[in-house]
Regions:
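Membrane-integrated ABC transporters
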Residues: 1-46, 50-211, 216, 220, ...
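An intracellular "coupling" helix at the cytosolic face of ABC transporter transmembrane type-1 domains
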Residues: 24-26, 160, 252-253, 269-278, ...
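Transmembrane alpha-helical core residues of multi-pass small-molecule transporters
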Residues: 35, 39, 213, 217, ...
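Short intracellular "coupling" helices and adjacent cytoplasmic loop segments at the cytosolic face
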Residues: 2-10, 58-65, 72-76, 84, ...
Length: 736
C-alpha cells in the first residue's frame, strides 16, 4: 500500500515537472484558453442551430414566436377567450387594425420573447380549441345569454385554463414554443402572409450562421494549433538548451554517471515526448473540460431528462479505460529504458564496427542488437495491441449511447414531451461530453510516459557538477605556466582506493615533462587533473603559485592546449577545426600550426586545402591525420601549457621525431607535458616521471632513470636495444 502511494506521489511530482516547463509561456497559454472558449461556444452552438432548423425552420415554417405577425378580426377576438384581463389588455396593445387584419407592432426580439412567455398558455389553448371538430363550442362560449352570462362563461373558461395549464407545464419549453408557433403559422396563413417565404428566409439565415460558426471553428483551431506549437517548440528549445548547458558543464564524474547513449536519448526522444504532450495538453486537455462542462449545461437546458444515459456511458468508459491503463501502463514506463538500451547497443556497434569486423563478431553483435530490438518491439507491440482495443470499444459505447438516446427520445416524442430537433441536439451534446472524457483518458495514457521523460530530463538538469568555480575566484595575473603537484592523491567518485598516491612534481616552462608507465598506472588520470576534468582528493595543484581550484575554469583552460589520447575532430572544415581553440587565429597562424604538427603535406594535397570538409568525428581522414590535426589545433591556440596525452602513438617514428623537433623549436617558452608509451618519444625530455601503480617511482632525465629506476629500465629495454640505450651488453646482462 505504501509502495503504491509512493509511486502515485512520484507520478504526481513528475507531472508537475511537465507543467513547470509551461510556466514561462503563460501569455500564450492564456490566449490559447481564450480561443478554446470561443471554439467551444461555436461547437456548442451548432447543435442548437441544427435543432432550430428541424423544429423551427422545417416544422414551423421558420416562425419563431407564439404571437402571429397578422391575424383576422375574428381570430383576434377569439384569441382572448382564455386570457385574463391583464393579458387581454397586453394583447390589444401590441396589435393595430388594418382593415380586416390585425398586424403586430412589436419588432424587438426581447419584447417578443417576454410577450411569448405571457401569452403562450392562452394562445396554445385557443389553438387546441380551434382543432376541435365542434367549432360551435367557441361560438357558444363567446356569446353571453343573459346579464351575467358572459361573466359566468369567462369564469368557466379560466377554470378550464387552470386545469389545462398543469398539462402544458409538463411539456418542455421547446414543445410549448412549437405548439405556439403552429398557432402563429395558422393565423399568418389565414391573414394571407407567405409563410413559405418566411421559412426560406429562416433556413438561409440559419444556414449562413452555421457556415460562419464552422469558419470560426476552423480559424480558431488553426490559431490554437499555431500558439500551442509555438509553446511546444519553445519548451523543446529551452529544455535542449538547459540539458546542453548542463552536460557541457559536467565533469568526467557526471559523464561517467550518465552514459552517452542515455544523454542522447534524454536530449532527443525524451524532449520530443514532452514537446508533443505539451501541445496535446494545450489542444486537448485544456479543451476537454471546457467542452464537457458546456455540453452538460446545454443538456440541462434541453430539459430532456435523459442525463442518466450520459452518466452511465461515462462510467462505462472510465471503467474500460482504467482496465486498459492497468494493463498497458507498466509497459509504457519500461519503454523509455528499452529505447536507452537500443541506443546504447547501436552506438557501440556503429563506433566499434571495425573492431567487430576484425574479430569476426558480426553475427554475435547482430544477435545482441536483435535481443535489444526484440525487447523494444515486444513491448511496443504489447502496448499497441492493448491500445487497439480502445477505439473499437469507445465507438461501440458511443453507438450504444446514440441508440439509447434515440430509443428513449422516440418514446418522449411519441408522448409529446420532446421534439425531433431537441433529440438530435441531445445526441450531439452527449457525443461532445463523451468525447471530452475520451480526450482526457487518452491523455492519461500518454502523460505517464511523458512524466517519465520529464523526470529523466530533470535528473540531468538538477545534477550539479562536482567541479565548479570558487565563489571568490582569483584572477590570473601571471602567465608563466608553472604547474606544481603537491602531494596529490586521487580516487574516482564512489571508489574505495586511491588511483594516484602522493604525486609531487613541478613542470617548468621551457621544459618537457614526460610521464611514462605501464598501462593502467594512472598517467591519463594525472594529466586530466590539470584542466580539472576531475578534482584532486587530497593535496593541491597550482598554476603559477595559485591553486587551480581558486581559478575559474575558463581562465584555467585558456592557459591549456589539450590533446587527448583519441583525436577528436568536429564536422566542418580543416580550418574551422584548427581555429576551434582560437576563433580569431589568422590563416598564417593555422598554417604554421599545421606545419609544426607535420600536417601541411596532406592538407595541401587536398583540392580545397584548408577549406576541405571534415566529416562527423573526422571519419574521412586517417587516424594519423586526425591526430596531427588535433595536435595542430592545440598549437594554433598558442597556450602556455601543452598536454599531450599519449598523442604521438598514432604517428610513425619519422613523423613523431619531426613533430617533436618542430615542437621544441616553436614552443620554447611553454610548459610541455607528454604522456607517452614509447621511450623514443621522451628521450630528450628535461624531466621524466615514471608511474607504477599510481605512484611516482622515478624522476629525472633518461640517463638518470636508466641508472636509478628499475621500472624505467625494464620499459626501456623492452623497446630499445642496449646500443640504442647507450648501455654495454654486460650492463644489460648484469641488470637482468
Amino acid at each position: 500500500m505504501k509502495l503504491e502511494k509512493g509511486k502515485a506521489e512520484e507520478r504526481k511530482g513528475n507531472m508537475s515537472k511537465i507543467f513547470k516547463n509551461m510556466i514561462p509561456y503563460w501569455k500564450s497559454i492564456v490566449i490559447i484558453i481564450a480561443l478554446l472558449f470561443v471554439q467551444a461556444w461555436c461547437d456548442l452552438s451548432l447543435p442548437s442551430y441544427t435543432s432550430d432548423i428541424i423544429d423551427v425552420g422545417i416544422q414551423n415554417y421558420g416562425v419563431e414566436h407564439v404571437v402571429p405577425e397578422a391575424l383576422t378580426a375574428d381570430e383576434f377576438e377569439t384569441a382572448e377567450l382564455f386570457m385574463t384581463d391583464e393579458e387581454a389588455d397586453l394583447w390589444e396593445s401590441i396589435y393595430e387594425k388594418d382593415g380586416d387584419i390585425y398586424r403586430l407592432q412589436v419588432t424587438s426580439r426581447s419584447e417578443l420573447n417576454e410577450i411569448d412567455d405571457t401569452l403562450a398558455v392562452p394562445l396554445i389553448m385557443n389553438y387546441q380549441m380551434s382543432a376541435m371538430e365542434d367549432s360551435a363550442v367557441k361560438e357558444h362560449v363567446a356569446k353571453p345569454t343573459g346579464a351575467d352570462a358572459g361573466t359566468l362563461e369567462k369564469d368557466t373558461l379560466l377554470s378550464m385554463r387552470d386545469s389545462m395549464e398543469e398539462t402544458i407545464d409538463t411539456m418542455g419549453s421547446s414543445l410549448v414554443k412549437s405548439m405556439g408557433a403552429a398557432y402563429a403559422v395558422s393565423c399568418d396563413k389565414a391573414a394571407g402572409i407567405d409563410v413559405e417565404k418566411i421559412q426560406k428566409s429562416y433556413l438561409v439565415t440559419a444556414g449562413l450562421k452555421m457556415v460562419g460558426m464552422a469558419l470560426m471553428i476552423g480559424i480558431v483551431t488553426v490559431l490554437v494549433g499555431f500558439f500551442a506549437s509555438r509553446v511546444g517548440a519553445g519548451i523543446g528549445r529551452t529544455l535542449r538548451e538547459k540539458v546542453f548547458k548542463q552536460v557541457v558543464g559536467f565533469s568526467n564524474a557526471e559523464m561517467d554517471k550518465f552514459s552517452t547513449a542515455s544523454l542522447i536519448t534524454r536530449s532527443t526522444n525524451d524532449i520530443q515526448q514532452i514537446q508533443m504532450v505539451s501541445v496535446m495538453l494545450l489542444r486537448m486537455v485544456a479543451y476537454a473540460p471546457i467542452l464537457g462542462i458546456g455540453g452538460v449545461l446545454k443538456v440541462v437546458q434541453t430539459g430532456a431528462g435523459m442525463g442518466w444515459i450520459i452518466v452511465l456511458a461515462i462510467l462505462v468508459i472510465l471503467g474500460y479505460v482504467m482496465v486498459l491503463m492497468a494493463v498497458a501502463m507498466p509497459k509504457f514506463q519500461l519503454m523509455q529504458k528499452l529505447v536507452d538500451n537500443i541506443n546504447l547497443v547501436s552506438r557501440e556497434i556503429l563506433t566499434g564496427l571495425s573492431v567487430i569486423r576484425a574479430f569476426g563478431r558480426e553475427k554475435k553483435e547482430e544477435e545482441r542488437f536483435d535481443v535489444a530490438n526484440k525487447d523494444l518491439t515486444k513491448t511496443m507491440l504489447f502496448t499497441n495491441r492493448v491500445m487497439t482495443f480502445m477505439m473499437p470499444g469507445m465507438m461501440m459505447i458511443m453507438n450504444v449511447l446514440s441508440v439509447g438516446i434515440v430509443w428513449v427520445g422516440a418514446h418522449k416524442i411519441d408522448a409529446g414531451t420532446m421534439q425531433v430537433g431537441a433529440m438530435t441536439a441531445f445526441i450531439t451534446y452527449a457525443m461532445m461530453i463523451v468525447m471530452s472524457f475520451l480526450m482526457l483518458t487518452m491523455m492519461s495514457i500518454m502523460l505517464p510516459r511523458a512524466a517519465v521523460a520529464a523526470d529523466r530530463i530533470d535528473e540531468v538538469i538538477q545534477t550539479e557538477s562536482s567541479i565548479h568555480d570558487a565563489k571568490e575566484p582569483e584572477k590570473v595575473t601571471t602567465h608563466n605556466g608553472v604547474v606544481k603537484f603537491s602531494h596529490v592523491n586521487f580516487k574516482y567518485p564512489g571508489a574505495e582506493e586511491d588511483v594516484l598516491h602522493d604525486i609531487d612534481f613541478t613542470a617548468e616552462p621551457g621544459q618537457i615533462t614526460a610521464i611514462i608507465g605501464s598501462t593502467g598506472c594512472g598517467k591519463s588520470t594525472l594529466v586530466n587533473l590539470i584542466p580539472r576534468l576531475y578534482d584532486v582528493t587530497d593535496g593541491s595543484i597550482t598554476l603559477d603559485g595559485k591553486d587551480i581550484r581558486n581559478i575559474t575554469m575558463s581562465d584555467l583552460r585558456d592557459e591549456i592546449g589539450f590533446v587527448p589520447q583519441k583525436g577528436v575532430l568536429f564536422s566542418g572544415t580543416i580550418a574551422s577545426n584548427l581555429r576551434f581553440g582560437k576563433d580569431d587565429a589568422t590563416d598564417e597562424e593555422i598554417k604554421k600550426a599545421a606545419e609544426i604538427a607535420q600536417a601541411t603535406e596532406f592538407i595541401e594535397a587536398k583540392d580545397d586545402k584548408y577549406e576541405s570538409a571534415i566529416a562527423q568525428g573526422g571519419s574521412n581522414v586517417s587516424g594519423g591525420q586526425k591526430q596531427r590535426l588535433a595536435i595542430a589545433r592545440a598549437i594554433a591556440k598558442d597556450p602556455k601549457i601543452f598536454i599531450f596525452d599519449d598523442s604521438f602513438s598514432a604517428l610513425d617514428l619519422k613523423t613523431d621525431a619531426a613533430l617533436r623537433k618542430a615542437l621544441a623549436e616553436n614552443v620554447k617558452d611553454s610548459t610541455v607535458i607528454i604522456v607517452a608509451q614509447r621511450i623514443s618519444t621522451i628521450l630528450h625530455a628535461e624531466q621524466i616521471l615514471v608511474l607504477d601503480d599510481g605512484k611516482i617511482v622515478g624522476k629525472g632525465t633518461h640517463e638518470e632513470l636508466l641508472k636509478s629506476c628499475e621500472v624505467y629500465r625494464q620499459i626501456a629495454k623492452s623497446q630499445l636495444s642496449a646500443k640504442e640505450l647507450g648501455l654495454e651488453e654486460s650492463e644489460v646482462a648484469l641488470n637482468e
